[in-house]
């Protein structure tokens, strides 16, 4: 059996924020959610989050996740003290405990799987993740024998000049035999200048303790301030974009593009510069997205072109051309082979196949049939100051330029709306509707002002 404990009690004063450090977002997820997510690769039987500073806020953020147990650390007296709080919660647990930090979000599943496998294969009392850094300044050093068995962990401030030449550092990720750890946890003492209980001190009481080097030391990058948060985002983005390019996606100018790791892309998608893909977005093969576009929590069908546009919480079917400067939001559904042109906004509306909305229109709370042509400047006046109302437009209908459709309203099939009309009443199939003042010409009008 495997239990996972995540240290999430700290305040994170260097973040200069009222938000607990572990709740700061890295892309689409908070730091601690990323740690929980990667730990799922081990299929743990128990998942414990140790909380302290603004613990209720951490609880509220994670309440949508299944089977999370919260352990309160009322005083933050170090990592060893945090793990001591687990004793009553794991009283009957028999198995291994993986200890992770809630502010180390870049670990890969393979790294944790390898750590656990080595720990179990060797029957270790403890196994810790280490790294060889080119510049280990600021980190405690790990000293091992030729079999990678840990003999000593020394904090940098306590290192001699000779010890500082060792570049192997402690990554702060541990796997313990819980029964052996629980037996010695009460023996920890705050024997240091900070008055804290260090988890690293258990090395003096457990045997054997083995070190496992991580292949990419960037995986154990911790987040302590906003600069490190930004650096972690860059690392995450590089991973995501490299993976998609290896899978057949073209990304033009990757440095100007962001793709969250919750996005799903197909082969032969082309991502133009200054494009940002977020949330649970899915983009099918043959699409060309950008430049200058933002798509969030949306599903894009095959062979769609999106130029300089914003799409959120919406669906675009295959063969459409969106933009430039279009805005689709609030569950907009665009049928196949539609054109949504410049300065068009569509909100909570369903658009039938082969419909054209070429420019300068607003459609809200509307349902359009197939092969509708929406003239320039057409808007649905869907809000009466209290409620939103529906507009229905039948297939084959054409609206003239500068038309206003005042909801609730139903236009039949093959209706023609004359330019400049304000329509307030339902219109039957195959009708021409004109609702505007008759033109008057007053000759010689200017003469009176001369």
Swiss-Prot record:
Binds 1 Mg(2+) ion per subunit. Mg(2+) binds at residues 103, 224. One of its GO terms (cellular component) is carboxysome. It catalyses: alpha-D-glucosamine 1-phosphate + acetyl-CoA = N-acetyl-alpha-D-glucosamine 1-phosphate + CoA + H(+); N-acetyl-alpha-D-glucosamine 1-phosphate + UTP + H(+) = UDP-N-acetyl-alpha-D-glucosamine + diphosphate. Keywords: Acyltransferase, Cell shape, Cell wall biogenesis/degradation, Cytoplasm, Magnesium, Metal-binding, Multifunctional enzyme, Nucleotidyltransferase, Peptidoglycan synthesis, Repeat, Transferase. Pathway: Nucleotide-sugar biosynthesis; UDP-N-acetyl-alpha-D-glucosamine biosynthesis; N-acetyl-alpha-D-glucosamine 1-phosphate from alpha-D-glucosamine 6-phosphate (route II): step 2/2; Nucleotide-sugar biosynthesis; UDP-N-acetyl-alpha-D-glucosamine biosynthesis; UDP-N-acetyl-alpha-D-glucosamine from N-acetyl-alpha-D-glucosamine 1-phosphate: step 1/1; Bacterial outer membrane biogenesis; LPS lipid A biosynthesis. It comes from the Bacteria. Its EC number is 2.7.7.23, 2.3.1.157. Residues 248-450 are annotated as: N-acetyltransferase. Homotrimer. This is Bifunctional protein GlmU.
